[in-house]
């Protein structure tokens, strides 16, 4: 078990974080909201300095030659190698290795040993949803381009041509009616640490402004 708070993120959002484009996340204040806990946080962090461990869609392959598990991520990037003997919970990885040869496993089922990304909460505030600014929407990882609206990051609503319009479209799809303007918790975060396999890629962020991820 991890002492940290689990947060499940889509492949697109993981890539946005690793590329330095996503540094905020908003969730409805109501703890019984159907998507807040089931599809994002397992429990809501409440203090600055709280640490989140990110779960994402993944596969596990067993390397019989090296007696290692290889964790492959839907967001792309290098696989994480985990020694079958030294891992704390080899049973969970073995189960996933047996069941995930062809299909991606949902992020909610990722064991802690497979995690490659940890975040630290740097600020928390409560505000109305529609208090979000254009800069905030950009910090949520939104992008837009001039093409028909598509319900997937990097662009959700490109016809209006703004990060805020993209975020509004994203909210409508994930949480429901934007016009209800609910209170939300706003979390600012930074990357605290990553797996050793990811460290070389993060070093390229300042040089390239983006990480050359490919999605399988």
Language model features: what each stretch is:
Residues 1-216:
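Secondary-structure transition motif
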């Amino acid at each position: 078990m991890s002492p940290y708070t689990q947060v499940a993120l889509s492949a697109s959002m993981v890539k946005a974080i690793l590329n330095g484009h996503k540094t905020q996340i908003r969730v409805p204040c109501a703890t019984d909201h159907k998507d807040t806990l089931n599809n994002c946080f397992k429990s809501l962090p409440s203090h600055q300095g709280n640490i989140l461990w990110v779960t994402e869609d993944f596969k596990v392959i067993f390397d019989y030659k090296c007696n290692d598990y290889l964790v492959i991520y839907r967001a792309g990037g290098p696989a994480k190698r985990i020694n079958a003997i030294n891992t704390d919970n080899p049973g969970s990885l073995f189960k996933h290795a047996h069941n995930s040869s062809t299909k991606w496993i949902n992020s909610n089922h990722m064991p802690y040993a497979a995690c490659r990304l940890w975040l630290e909460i740097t600020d928390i505030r409560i505000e109305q949803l529609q208090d979000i600014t254009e800069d905030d929407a950009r910090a949520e990882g939104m992008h837009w381009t001039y093409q028909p609206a598509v319900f997937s990051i990097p662009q959700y609503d490109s016809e209006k041509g703004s990060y805020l319009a993209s975020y509004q479209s994203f909210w409508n799809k994930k949480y429901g009616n934007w016009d209800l303007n609910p209170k939300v918790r706003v979390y600012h975060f930074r990357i605290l640490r990553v797996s050793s396999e990811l460290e070389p890629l993060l070093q390229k962020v300042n040089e390239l402004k983006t990480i050359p991820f490919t999605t399988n």
